[in-house]
Regions:
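Feature captures hydrophobic
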Residues: 105-270
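Non-heme di-metal
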Residues: 1-148
Length: 270
Protein backbone atom coordinates (compact mmCIF):
# COMPACT_ATOMS: atom_id res chain seq x y z
CA UNK A 1 0.00 0.00 0.00
CA UNK A 2 2.85 2.38 0.76
CA UNK A 3 4.75 1.69 -2.46
CA UNK A 4 2.82 4.06 -4.78
CA UNK A 5 3.36 7.13 -2.57
CA UNK A 6 6.94 6.08 -1.91
CA UNK A 7 7.50 5.91 -5.66
CA UNK A 8 6.30 9.49 -6.18
CA UNK A 9 8.26 10.89 -3.24
CA UNK A 10 11.42 9.13 -4.39
CA UNK A 11 10.91 10.42 -7.92
CA UNK A 12 10.44 14.00 -6.66
CA UNK A 13 13.74 14.14 -4.79
CA UNK A 14 15.60 12.37 -7.59
CA UNK A 15 14.46 15.01 -10.09
CA UNK A 16 15.09 17.89 -7.67
CA UNK A 17 18.57 16.64 -6.83
CA UNK A 18 18.03 17.56 -3.17
CA UNK A 19 18.48 15.46 -0.02
CA UNK A 20 20.85 12.94 -1.65
CA UNK A 21 21.20 10.97 1.58
CA UNK A 22 17.43 10.64 1.87
CA UNK A 23 17.16 9.59 -1.78
CA UNK A 24 19.87 6.95 -1.33
CA UNK A 25 18.02 5.55 1.67
CA UNK A 26 14.69 5.49 -0.18
CA UNK A 27 16.35 3.63 -3.04
CA UNK A 28 17.51 0.92 -0.63
CA UNK A 29 14.03 0.71 0.92
CA UNK A 30 12.52 0.33 -2.55
CA UNK A 31 14.84 -2.54 -3.44
CA UNK A 32 14.03 -4.24 -0.15
CA UNK A 33 10.29 -3.86 -0.71
CA UNK A 34 10.58 -5.26 -4.23
CA UNK A 35 12.09 -8.41 -2.76
CA UNK A 36 9.22 -8.67 -0.27
CA UNK A 37 6.64 -8.17 -3.00
CA UNK A 38 8.34 -10.68 -5.29
CA UNK A 39 8.35 -13.26 -2.51
CA UNK A 40 4.67 -12.67 -1.78
CA UNK A 41 3.69 -12.98 -5.44
CA UNK A 42 5.62 -16.25 -5.75
CA UNK A 43 4.00 -17.71 -2.62
CA UNK A 44 0.51 -16.79 -3.82
CA UNK A 45 1.22 -18.20 -7.29
CA UNK A 46 2.18 -21.56 -5.79
CA UNK A 47 -0.76 -21.61 -3.36
CA UNK A 48 -3.30 -20.69 -6.03
CA UNK A 49 -1.91 -23.37 -8.35
CA UNK A 50 -2.47 -26.02 -5.69
CA UNK A 51 -5.77 -25.02 -4.10
CA UNK A 52 -9.04 -23.35 -5.07
CA UNK A 53 -9.61 -22.89 -1.34
CA UNK A 54 -6.65 -20.50 -1.23
CA UNK A 55 -8.19 -18.47 -4.03
CA UNK A 56 -11.47 -18.26 -2.12
CA UNK A 57 -9.66 -17.16 1.04
CA UNK A 58 -7.79 -14.44 -0.83
CA UNK A 59 -11.00 -13.18 -2.42
CA UNK A 60 -12.76 -13.04 0.93
CA UNK A 61 -9.90 -11.09 2.46
CA UNK A 62 -9.96 -8.58 -0.39
CA UNK A 63 -13.74 -8.22 -0.04
CA UNK A 64 -13.26 -7.25 3.60
CA UNK A 65 -10.31 -4.87 3.43
CA UNK A 66 -10.42 -3.03 0.10
CA UNK A 67 -13.02 -0.39 1.12
CA UNK A 68 -10.80 0.55 4.07
CA UNK A 69 -7.33 0.26 2.55
CA UNK A 70 -8.34 2.84 -0.05
CA UNK A 71 -8.20 5.42 2.75
CA UNK A 72 -4.55 4.75 3.67
CA UNK A 73 -3.32 7.62 1.49
CA UNK A 74 -5.96 10.17 2.54
CA UNK A 75 -4.08 13.14 4.06
CA UNK A 76 -5.06 14.61 7.45
CA UNK A 77 -8.10 16.87 7.09
CA UNK A 78 -7.91 16.30 3.34
CA UNK A 79 -5.02 18.76 3.10
CA UNK A 80 -3.71 17.85 -0.35
CA UNK A 81 -0.53 19.82 0.18
CA UNK A 82 0.78 16.58 1.67
CA UNK A 83 0.96 15.35 -1.93
CA UNK A 84 0.95 18.45 -4.13
CA UNK A 85 4.11 19.76 -2.45
CA UNK A 86 5.82 16.69 -3.90
CA UNK A 87 4.46 17.39 -7.37
CA UNK A 88 1.62 14.86 -7.56
CA UNK A 89 -2.05 14.47 -6.69
CA UNK A 90 -4.00 11.77 -4.87
CA UNK A 91 -5.43 10.63 -8.19
CA UNK A 92 -1.89 10.00 -9.44
CA UNK A 93 -1.20 7.71 -6.47
CA UNK A 94 -4.42 5.76 -6.88
CA UNK A 95 -4.00 5.35 -10.64
CA UNK A 96 -0.41 4.16 -10.23
CA UNK A 97 -1.46 1.88 -7.36
CA UNK A 98 -4.22 0.23 -9.39
CA UNK A 99 -1.91 -0.47 -12.31
CA UNK A 100 0.70 -1.90 -9.95
CA UNK A 101 -1.75 -4.07 -8.01
CA UNK A 102 -3.36 -5.42 -11.17
CA UNK A 103 0.03 -6.43 -12.58
CA UNK A 104 1.03 -8.19 -9.36
CA UNK A 105 -2.24 -10.10 -9.06
CA UNK A 106 -1.94 -11.13 -12.70
CA UNK A 107 1.52 -12.50 -11.89
CA UNK A 108 0.00 -14.67 -9.14
CA UNK A 109 -2.10 -16.46 -11.76
CA UNK A 110 -5.32 -15.09 -10.27
CA UNK A 111 -6.00 -11.68 -11.91
CA UNK A 112 -8.30 -9.33 -10.02
CA UNK A 113 -10.96 -9.43 -12.73
CA UNK A 114 -11.15 -13.24 -12.30
CA UNK A 115 -12.22 -12.87 -8.66
CA UNK A 116 -15.91 -13.24 -7.74
CA UNK A 117 -18.24 -10.29 -8.42
CA UNK A 118 -17.84 -7.41 -5.99
CA UNK A 119 -14.16 -7.92 -5.23
CA UNK A 120 -12.85 -5.50 -7.84
CA UNK A 121 -15.99 -3.89 -9.28
CA UNK A 122 -14.41 -1.52 -11.78
CA UNK A 123 -14.88 -1.17 -15.51
CA UNK A 124 -11.69 -2.69 -16.97
CA UNK A 125 -12.07 -0.48 -20.05
CA UNK A 126 -12.12 2.72 -17.97
CA UNK A 127 -8.75 4.52 -17.79
CA UNK A 128 -7.00 4.15 -14.46
CA UNK A 129 -6.96 7.91 -13.93
CA UNK A 130 -10.75 8.11 -14.29
CA UNK A 131 -11.20 5.17 -11.92
CA UNK A 132 -8.93 6.93 -9.43
CA UNK A 133 -10.99 10.11 -9.65
CA UNK A 134 -14.15 8.15 -8.85
CA UNK A 135 -12.52 6.48 -5.86
CA UNK A 136 -11.34 9.81 -4.46
CA UNK A 137 -14.86 11.24 -4.85
CA UNK A 138 -16.31 8.36 -2.81
CA UNK A 139 -13.60 8.85 -0.18
CA UNK A 140 -14.26 12.58 0.04
CA UNK A 141 -17.97 11.90 0.42
CA UNK A 142 -17.37 9.51 3.33
CA UNK A 143 -18.83 6.57 1.38
CA UNK A 144 -15.49 4.74 1.44
CA UNK A 145 -12.66 4.98 3.92
CA UNK A 146 -12.92 6.32 7.44
CA UNK A 147 -16.57 6.48 8.60
CA UNK A 148 -17.81 9.95 9.48
CA UNK A 149 -21.43 9.19 10.35
CA UNK A 150 -22.71 11.61 7.72
CA UNK A 151 -21.73 10.42 4.25
CA UNK A 152 -22.43 13.09 1.69
CA UNK A 153 -24.61 12.38 -1.32
CA UNK A 154 -25.01 14.17 -4.63
CA UNK A 155 -26.03 12.85 -8.05
CA UNK A 156 -22.44 12.05 -9.04
CA UNK A 157 -21.55 10.23 -5.81
CA UNK A 158 -24.81 8.29 -5.88
CA UNK A 159 -24.26 7.31 -9.51
CA UNK A 160 -20.73 6.08 -8.81
CA UNK A 161 -21.81 3.95 -5.84
CA UNK A 162 -24.68 2.34 -7.72
CA UNK A 163 -22.42 1.61 -10.67
CA UNK A 164 -20.20 -0.27 -8.21
CA UNK A 165 -23.24 -2.06 -6.77
CA UNK A 166 -24.42 -3.10 -10.23
CA UNK A 167 -20.95 -4.41 -11.12
CA UNK A 168 -20.91 -6.35 -7.84
CA UNK A 169 -24.00 -8.40 -8.71
CA UNK A 170 -23.53 -12.13 -9.19
CA UNK A 171 -25.65 -12.75 -12.27
CA UNK A 172 -25.38 -16.52 -11.80
CA UNK A 173 -27.49 -16.24 -8.64
CA UNK A 174 -30.73 -15.44 -10.51
CA UNK A 175 -32.92 -17.54 -12.78
CA UNK A 176 -34.92 -14.70 -14.36
CA UNK A 177 -34.65 -10.92 -14.84
CA UNK A 178 -34.96 -9.05 -11.55
CA UNK A 179 -35.06 -5.41 -10.49
CA UNK A 180 -34.12 -3.97 -7.10
CA UNK A 181 -35.31 -0.49 -6.18
CA UNK A 182 -33.89 1.83 -3.51
CA UNK A 183 -36.03 4.68 -2.14
CA UNK A 184 -34.05 7.12 -0.01
CA UNK A 185 -35.47 9.64 2.42
CA UNK A 186 -32.63 12.05 1.64
CA UNK A 187 -31.46 11.14 -1.87
CA UNK A 188 -32.80 10.36 -5.32
CA UNK A 189 -34.26 6.87 -5.86
CA UNK A 190 -32.09 4.38 -7.71
CA UNK A 191 -32.56 0.90 -9.12
CA UNK A 192 -30.42 -1.99 -10.34
CA UNK A 193 -31.75 -4.28 -13.06
CA UNK A 194 -30.22 -7.69 -13.75
CA UNK A 195 -31.26 -9.28 -17.03
CA UNK A 196 -29.74 -12.11 -19.07
CA UNK A 197 -26.34 -11.97 -17.41
CA UNK A 198 -25.99 -8.18 -17.56
CA UNK A 199 -26.62 -5.49 -14.97
CA UNK A 200 -27.45 -1.81 -15.18
CA UNK A 201 -28.10 0.93 -12.64
CA UNK A 202 -30.42 3.87 -13.19
CA UNK A 203 -31.71 6.93 -11.37
CA UNK A 204 -35.42 7.12 -10.69
CA UNK A 205 -38.23 4.66 -10.14
CA UNK A 206 -38.25 1.41 -12.10
CA UNK A 207 -41.40 -0.14 -13.47
CA UNK A 208 -42.48 -3.25 -11.57
CA UNK A 209 -39.53 -3.57 -9.17
CA UNK A 210 -39.29 -7.01 -7.57
CA UNK A 211 -37.93 -5.65 -4.28
CA UNK A 212 -38.04 -2.09 -2.94
CA UNK A 213 -35.80 -0.99 -0.07
CA UNK A 214 -36.73 2.20 1.78
CA UNK A 215 -33.93 3.70 3.86
CA UNK A 216 -31.60 6.67 4.32
CA UNK A 217 -28.37 7.26 2.44
CA UNK A 218 -26.23 6.89 5.58
CA UNK A 219 -27.87 3.63 6.62
CA UNK A 220 -27.42 2.13 3.16
CA UNK A 221 -23.76 3.15 3.04
CA UNK A 222 -23.22 1.29 6.34
CA UNK A 223 -24.59 -1.88 4.74
CA UNK A 224 -23.16 -1.50 1.23
CA UNK A 225 -19.58 -0.49 2.04
CA UNK A 226 -18.96 -1.11 5.73
CA UNK A 227 -20.31 -4.60 6.26
CA UNK A 228 -23.22 -3.80 8.58
CA UNK A 229 -25.63 -6.74 8.59
CA UNK A 230 -28.61 -5.88 6.38
CA UNK A 231 -30.78 -8.30 8.37
CA UNK A 232 -30.17 -6.34 11.56
CA UNK A 233 -30.89 -3.11 9.73
CA UNK A 234 -34.23 -4.57 8.62
CA UNK A 235 -35.05 -5.76 12.14
CA UNK A 236 -34.36 -2.25 13.40
CA UNK A 237 -36.49 -0.81 10.59
CA UNK A 238 -33.56 1.16 9.22
CA UNK A 239 -34.13 -0.67 5.95
CA UNK A 240 -37.78 -1.39 5.14
CA UNK A 241 -38.19 -3.98 2.37
CA UNK A 242 -41.26 -4.52 0.25
CA UNK A 243 -41.97 -6.92 -2.59
CA UNK A 244 -40.97 -10.48 -3.41
CA UNK A 245 -39.80 -12.41 -0.36
CA UNK A 246 -38.10 -14.91 -2.66
CA UNK A 247 -35.96 -12.24 -4.33
CA UNK A 248 -35.32 -10.52 -1.01
CA UNK A 249 -33.98 -13.80 0.39
CA UNK A 250 -31.71 -14.10 -2.65
CA UNK A 251 -30.15 -10.66 -2.24
CA UNK A 252 -27.17 -11.88 -0.12
CA UNK A 253 -26.29 -14.29 -2.95
CA UNK A 254 -26.79 -11.72 -5.68
CA UNK A 255 -24.93 -8.99 -3.79
CA UNK A 256 -22.50 -10.86 -1.50
CA UNK A 257 -22.14 -8.83 1.71
CA UNK A 258 -18.81 -7.69 3.01
CA UNK A 259 -17.66 -9.45 6.20
CA UNK A 260 -19.10 -7.73 9.25
CA UNK A 261 -16.90 -5.05 10.75
CA UNK A 262 -16.01 -5.27 14.43
CA UNK A 263 -16.48 -1.53 14.89
CA UNK A 264 -19.71 0.08 15.99
CA UNK A 265 -21.86 1.50 13.20
CA UNK A 266 -22.22 5.23 12.82
CA UNK A 267 -25.24 7.42 12.26
CA UNK A 268 -28.73 6.14 13.03
CA UNK A 269 -27.59 2.50 13.08
CA UNK A 270 -25.78 3.08 16.40
Amino acid sequence: MAQPAQHFIEDFFAKAGSLPGFSAGMEKVSRDEQRHIGFGVKVLYELFAESEECKAAASEMLREILPFTLAVMVPPNWDERYTTEYGFELEDIYAFGMRSVEMKWKATGYPLHDHPPGIYPFDPEMPHRERAQRQVKLLRAGVLGEPNGKPRVDPEVEGILFDVIARSADTDAIDRPVTFQWKFEDAEPYYVRIDNGSTSAGRGLADHADVTLSTTWADWVEVATRGYDARLAMLRRKIRPRGSLRQLARMPKIFPPRPASSRQPTGSLQ
